[in-house]
Amino acid sequence: MQHSTSPALTPLPTRVRNPLVFRQITVKQADTVAGCFRRIVFHGDQLKGFSSAGFDDHIKIFFPDRETGELHLPQVTPEGIVWGDQRPASRDYTPLHFDATTNELTVDFFIHAQGLASDWAVAAKPGDGLAMGGPRGSLVVPETYAHQIYLCDESGLPALRRRLLALAPHQHITLTVLVSLHRPEAKAYLADLDHVQCEWLPADAAQLNARMAALALPPEDSFIWVTGEGEGVKAISDQLIERGVNPDRLRAVAYWHQK
């Protein structure tokens, strides 16, 4: 007698912890991409040993004092992190690519009005210095889920790009990519990825909720990634869980908050 068996499910994502290391890095190259991103390539000996196992990892970038140009870094002690009198301004960014042979780290900065990081990135030139810490931890998401859904806005495009590049060899997966745009020119950011068909959506919370509500939920061997503005991400996450999505196969992260 033959017994039918269901296909084995892809394992759940796993978390990896990394030692906390602060590094000073230097701009090697800076270019504008898709009209609204600055692609900065950093280098430096302190990048030796850098590791980023998760496609949506974040590193914390510390910016120089706007008046003095000085970088103020903490000390890492057995008791924890010790900051000096001046704690530098910082922002979180996704490591797009790291080349361990050349110790070069690529980070894409989304350019928007009146942003500390945006202002720095627009003016960045070879030789400029920054400091960074992390990633402190990674969520390692298998690439072989049969069905994968990704939803983000411009803030999540670097992580999405990194993921889509990694998925390119996997021809068997069913991929749904939804991107909410405040700036239409950002469409060009993924234009070179011929294996991906994106659905471009307006930056409207009600329309995003409606689109996700209309989306057919994938079978069990699936992964869903949702990022963007905090309240919108929570609303979509709650909706998906109410519809029966396994929370262990859903990654919902607020990348920014409406003020």
Task: Place the predicted regions along the sequence by residue.
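Extended, composition-driven regions rather than compact fold-specific motifs
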Residues: 1-259
